[in-house]
């Protein structure tokens, strides 16, 4: 199935969102450390840890945690007293939750039209990928309900939570089986807004994510910049399974991620049907065991295999009955079913795999392929995979590949996947289950009293989507200009400038979203500009003291010398509007130069005269007034 064949309603597309944003508080969520990232990662102290899953209160292991444990990874944590303490190292109990962060979460809940809980209970969410020293992430439900509007209908809000951000990955070694983490990011407050799976199209997913992001930003108290916003997308289709896609950084990438994931699931369902039609059963695959075929590749031309053998590694093959043609089946652009198997293999510490649908290739000869098929007892229609590397890792990777091949008979396994820059995704781990969550025993519940909620409700800003409509209507602005002001975060400044200077709204908006960014691009130190600078420049324009063309020049000069007086600077730059007498003098001088041609050609020379006059005045005169004067003098001379 191709992308253009997808009908969202027909395939039953369902999408939910989880929007995360770091909060700009004075302390971390569960300690007093400063919530900032360090410029230089410390080398010491360095703490070594191994993490293991524990059973839930029901005696169950979370499948995602169990899968991580099978990778047998080692983690090293780099800490420094300037940004972390014993809480981050899990050597001291957590402190009470940050009240600033809690206030932001309450306000976001209220702005979205949701309800705030009476008591906040901190929970532990098991995570043993090394990003949390404790082996779990602390999270708390603050609100539920509400909705955001989209052009395709409202999207309901499921929950608003507060959680601690994860440690920052610094470096991975040996196929990520050893990882260094910096503890500066661990514990920074993070708000998470989750939706119900109400979204029905890829574009609606982007729109809903934008609306939620606007609401969080409108409340304030949030960080900005790279890495402060993370968007997870949950996607499923009819007959498929929910996939949690992590880390979609770019808002505009969301539609592509949704499309490609829907396409991937649709093709996995087709593969399931094809395997069933071929009569492949789970028993057929269970009976297949990995086989050592190292001797087949003793003199191989494959650089990958030869390198592993030189390191003392082995080569194993696994028969996949009935999988011929399936392994090379494209699921979405650039991703085949064989790629899915390779993802599972890599999680066990090998560099990848070869599959029969792509062989002979990569230095593996036809003779070697045939020798492997004979060793495995492969028949027509069968496929196989090859993995090279250390024997223990190869065996573990083969186990994962075999499990994934068996899953193909059932359709689409529920997974947590990572978003890639091209919009495709790759396997990370199984979807977590209910056994993942259990109560935090070190922090008592936080009671949210009604007075606190009422006080915060009085501080709520206007809903961003309603404010956009009002700005467009009240100030006569186009939708694109309004959107640009929101993107640049200058809406408050815009309204303040218009109210205090009386300048035309379109000029004020264009100055904030076009002129100042252009000056920055040209190398001007625009960080030196304050809103008072902008107001004074636009006031001069509104009063007719400078021309519109002088706005950018004056702002650039003020950026370079912010202590200057704007009016005096305008005089020095020669951008003060010309007086009526000066305009008349310049016009008269041009008329004298062209008097003979005026008598010959009349109005035909008006364009040349206008050009010269405006060049002399350098935009310091209203073009309409200049045109009137020139036209009047030409008529007097030519008699037209």
Curated annotation (Swiss-Prot):
It holds the Pfam family GatB_N. GO terms for molecular function: aminoacyl-tRNA ligase activity; ATP binding; glutaminyl-tRNA synthase (glutamine-hydrolyzing) activity. InterPro entries: Asn/Gln-tRNA_amidoTrfase_suB/E, Asn/Gln-tRNA_Trfase_suB/E_cat, Asn/Gln_amidotransferase, Asn/Gln_tRNA_amidoTrase-B-like, GAD-like_sf, GAD_dom, GatB_C_1, GatB_Yqey_C_2. One of its GO terms (biological process) is translation. Its EC number is 6.3.5.-. GO terms for cellular component: cytoplasm. It catalyses: L-glutamyl-tRNA(Gln) + L-glutamine + ATP + H2O = L-glutaminyl-tRNA(Gln) + L-glutamate + ADP + phosphate + H(+). Keywords: ATP-binding, Ligase, Nucleotide-binding, Protein biosynthesis. SMART domains: GatB_Yqey. Allows the formation of correctly charged Gln-tRNA(Gln) through the transamidation of misacylated Glu-tRNA(Gln) in organisms which lack glutaminyl-tRNA synthetase. The reaction takes place in the presence of glutamine and ATP through an activated gamma-phospho-Glu-tRNA(Gln). The GatDE system is specific for glutamate and does not act on aspartate. Belongs to the GatB/GatE family. GatE subfamily. Heterodimer of GatD and GatE. This is Glutamyl-tRNA(Gln) amidotransferase subunit E. It comes from Methanopyrus kandleri (strain AV19 / DSM 6324 / JCM 9639 / NBRC 100938).
